[in-house]
């Protein structure tokens, strides 16, 4: 990955959202790097047959990272060896930012920010045992308090190709007023490797503001992309205009990919995606109530065609989508 000639755009891993069907849709709008939903090392080692599907990728994904979590060195090593057999995976990203209690309270995700020596040791374990060309890490600014300097200095000793920094602590969760781009800039000044800024990037204007403040080598976007996958196209072209895409066709394409990938259960799974796509549209609440009752492919498709019977969004700027606690 050459960070010298352009600012790279990443789709953030979001549990329950950034599966293969969604990544396939987003990839068409110019995102450079896609990442799997977070997969625990334990699941990879002890339930690989069930977990493997989360690590499949579409032919469009030319830079695809498998994101794993874990805190036990031996289990992480075995998980990496499992991924080694997956030739389509281009690299491994290590999650040290997930704030969910069931993850962090067991020393995984953002819980590793309380023991930076162990965090670096795990990153070395990944690098020493992987056959992939790229390894990376995603962190927050700290667990309860901000320690950006300490994290940056520690990661200078870690064998990773780039660092993704979410501009909040674990305690901040997703509070909008807690975002701190200056601390990302501080880490950028210390780290001797590329830094990717993440958090609250919801428009073209915000994207360039964050790049200016942080001097980051790229941006990672999650929630804003759920409703407006084209935000990557807008940033790449520095425009607030929308690409030539009919929203109804995009939603239908995403739905068809869900059914193809998951079978009939893809209908129910797609409800949350429809909630995101409908946010900000007229009658969105009634539409959400309606789709929450639909279980058949035919009726869901008809509902989508009826509701999204308009060529474009009513608003240019993506609205936030609330995520569940599992989301990273």
Residue ranges of model-derived segments:
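Flavin-dependent oxidoreductase catalytic cores
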Residues: 1-328
């Amino acid at each position: 990955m050459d960070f010298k000639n352009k600012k790279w755009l990443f789709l953030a891993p979001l549990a329950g959202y950034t599966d293969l069907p969604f990544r396939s849709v987003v990839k068409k709008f110019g995102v450079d790097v896609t990442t799997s939903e977070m997969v625990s090392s334990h699941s990879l080692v002890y339930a690989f047959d069930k977990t493997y599907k989360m690590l499949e990728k579409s032919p469009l994904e030319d830079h695809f990272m498998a994101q794993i979590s874990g805190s036990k060195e031996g289990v992480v090593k075995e998980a990496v060896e499992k991924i080694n057999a997956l030739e389509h995976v281009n690299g491994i990203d290590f999650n040290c930012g997930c704030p969910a209690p069931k993850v962090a309270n067991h020393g995984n995700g953002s819980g590793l920010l309380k023991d930076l020596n162990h965090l670096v040791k795990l990153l070395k374990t990944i690098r020493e045992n992987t056959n992939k060309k790229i390894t990376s890490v995603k962190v927050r600014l700290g667990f309860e308090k901000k320690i950006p300097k300490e994290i940056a200095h520690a990661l200078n000793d870690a064998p990773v190709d780039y660092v993704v920094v979410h501009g909040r602590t674990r305690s901040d969760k997703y509070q909008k007023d807690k975002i701190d781009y200056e601390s990302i800039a501080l880490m950028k000044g210390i780290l001797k490797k590329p830094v990717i800024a993440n958090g609250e990037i919801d428009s073209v204007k915000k994207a360039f503001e964050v790049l200016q403040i942080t001097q980051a080598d790229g941006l990672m976007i999650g929630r804003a992309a759920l409703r407006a996958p084209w935000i990557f196209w807008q940033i790449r072209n520095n425009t607030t205009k929308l690409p030539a895409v009919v929203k109804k066709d995009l939603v239908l394409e995403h739905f068809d990919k869900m059914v193809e990938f998951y079978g009939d259960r893809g209908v129910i799974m797609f409800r949350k995606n429809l909630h995101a796509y409908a946010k900000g549209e007229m009658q969105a609440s009634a539409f959400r109530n309606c789709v929450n009752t639909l279980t058949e492919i035919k009726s869901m498709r008809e509902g989508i065609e009826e509701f999204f019977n308009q060529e474009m969004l009513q608003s240019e700027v993506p609205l936030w989508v609330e995520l569940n606690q599992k989301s990273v």
